[in-house]
Amino acid sequence: IKVFDEEARKLEGISFLAQGTIYPDILESDGVKAHHNVGGLPEDMDFELVEPVKLLFKDEVRVVGRALGLPVSMVERQPFPGPGLGVRCLGAITRDRLAALRESDAILREEFGKAGLAEKVWQFFTVVPDFRSTGVRDGKRAFDWPVIIRAVNTVDAMTATVPEIPWTVLQAITSRVLTEVPGVCRVLYDLTPKPVGTIEWE
């Protein structure tokens, strides 16, 4: 917030701040989890907050987008957290874990695309937690990061199910992550529906 406030003060002639807050963000912020875009802005900001879709669910936002004639690539794109990859790089954000997150996520997207899953799965991404796991590489102990694959299907983002991803696709992702991403020694697949888990880990 401090950096945002500093950068905002450098701008001239800007009166509004637009945010993509949707209704599930508001509902979940009341006792489930904190959302960056719900009640997190300083009161003394000189912007008027504009949240045009804050009372709509994700599927309703897409209906509005299509009605407005927005490109399909924009209307159907996957949600991405406002704080960026920091939400998926759990704990202290370090260069090595952020690199592992970017590289593993790129592999996941490429393999889902090749398998025809990119259009069938509502949202998918990888997570790198802030703990290490023991592994074995070249006959020696490895103490590296795990990568967690998260994939969900939903309509309104209030509930979500975990799709059945073909084993061959999961094996291909795992093999590539373990051979192509430095500092990773384990790949996990998150099978948790919402509820009990939320879509994002944080």
Regions found by a protein language model. Name each.
Residues 1-202:
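ATP/NTP-dependent adenylation/nucleotidyl-transfer catalytic domains that generate, transfer
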